[in-house]
């Protein structure tokens, strides 16, 4: 288990980290490091077509990855009103975003977190990190450091000591263009 500085150093070195979120532990990496993204997909046994979520401390951290010009002012205001919080939005993506982040899609899933430890990681790292649940494919997501160690301990994942929030449901996922809810939260 590592402290904040060690976790940020691990991100800068291209490592995959495990960290607490609003409801479960997540695993993530630097969204601009292709090898780190490949390592993350390997740890999760996740198909690259599925894409990943970016989680950030602020909307400003997401601006290099998202194309808000394709959205109306009302759509952008709706997104901003839901953050920080447990709502993930599917938004248009900038072409400079690595395909391993977007998967088979021409959009990207993004969230501004309210979890203080994730905010601290993103602020110290200076940008968003990828986020997907910390578990091996087919197993339940981890809710404690002990569970992360049991499932992912031999994968080289750097674990950030912390507590998950009290959410029992996954985050809600909504489409920014249509407003449709794709997953209830």
UniProtKB/Swiss-Prot annotation:
Enzyme class: transferase
A GO term from the CC aspect: cytoplasm
Keyword Magnesium (UniProt): no
SUPFAM superfamilies: YrdC/RibB (SSF55821)
Reactions accelerated catalytically: L-threonine + hydrogencarbonate + ATP = L-threonylcarbamoyladenylate + diphosphate + H2O
Principal subcellular localisation of the protein: cytoplasm
Record domain YrdC-like: where: 1-185
Subcellular location: Cytoplasm
Disulfide partners: none
This protein's UniProt keywords: ATP-binding, Cytoplasm, Nucleotide-binding, Nucleotidyltransferase, Transferase, tRNA processing
tRNA processing in keyword set: yes
GO molecular function: ATP binding; double-stranded RNA binding; L-threonylcarbamoyladenylate synthase; tRNA binding
InterPro entries on file: DHBP_synth_RibB-like_a/b_dom, Sua5-like_dom, TC-AMP_synthase, TC-AMP_synthase_SUA5
Gene3D superfamilies per record: DHBP synthase
EC number annotated for this UniProt entry: 2.7.7.87
Gene Ontology biological process terms, A to Z: regulation of translational fidelity; tRNA threonylcarbamoyladenosine modification
The protein's role, per its UniProt record: Required for the formation of a threonylcarbamoyl group on adenosine at position 37 (t(6)A37) in tRNAs that read codons beginning with adenine. Catalyzes the conversion of L-threonine, HCO(3)(-)/CO(2) and ATP to give threonylcarbamoyl-AMP (TC-AMP) as the acyladenylate intermediate, with the release of diphosphate.
PANTHER family per UniProt: SUA5 (PTHR17490), THREONYLCARBAMOYL-AMP SYNTHASE (PTHR17490:SF18)
Protein name as annotated: Threonylcarbamoyl-AMP synthase
Source species of the chain: Aliivibrio fischeri (strain ATCC 700601 / ES114)
């Amino acid at each position: 288990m590592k402290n904040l500085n060690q976790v940020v150093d691990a991100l800068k070195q291209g490592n995959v980290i495990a960290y607490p979120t609003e409801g479960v532990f997540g695993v993530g990496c630097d969204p601009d490091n292709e090898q780190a993204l490949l390592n993350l997909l390997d740890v999760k046994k996740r198909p690259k077509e599925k894409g990943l979520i970016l989680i950030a401390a602020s909307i400003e951290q997401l601006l290099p990855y998202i194309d808000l010009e394709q959205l109306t002012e009302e759509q952008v205001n709706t997104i901003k009103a839901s953050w920080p919080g447990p709502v993930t939005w599917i938004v248009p993506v900038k072409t400079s975003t690595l395909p391993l982040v977007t998967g088979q899609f021409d959009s990207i899933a993004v969230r501004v977190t309210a979890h203080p430890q994730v905010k601290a990681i993103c602020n110290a790292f200076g940008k968003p990190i990828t986020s997907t649940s910390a578990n091996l494919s087919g197993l339940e997501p981890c809710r404690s450091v002990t569970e992360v160690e049991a499932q992912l301990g031999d994968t080289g994942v750097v674990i950030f000591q912390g507590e998950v929030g009290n959410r029992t449901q996954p985050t809600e996922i909504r489409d920014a263009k249509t407003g449709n809810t794709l997953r209830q939260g």
